[in-house]
Amino acid sequence: QGLFTSDQDLYTDSR
């Protein structure tokens, strides 16, 4: 994905 910056900033470009 790479569009979930609401939960954690690490899931923004980790997925």
Curated annotation (Swiss-Prot):
Its EC number is 1.11.1.7. Its cofactor is Ca(2+); heme b. It catalyses: 2 a phenolic donor + H2O2 = 2 a phenolic radical donor + 2 H2O. GO terms for molecular function: lactoperoxidase activity; metal ion binding. One of its GO terms (biological process) is hydrogen peroxide catabolic process. The keyword Ribosomal protein does not apply. Keywords: Calcium, Heme, Hydrogen peroxide, Iron, Metal-binding, Oxidoreductase, Peroxidase. Binds 2 calcium ions per subunit. Binds 1 heme b (iron(II)-protoporphyrin IX) group per subunit. It is an enzyme of class 1 (oxidoreductase). Belongs to the peroxidase family. Classical plant (class III) peroxidase subfamily. Removal of H(2)O(2), oxidation of toxic reductants, biosynthesis and degradation of lignin, suberization, auxin catabolism, response to environmental stresses such as wounding, pathogen attack and oxidative stress. These functions might be dependent on each isozyme/isoform in each plant tissue. This is Peroxidase 10. It comes from Daucus carota.
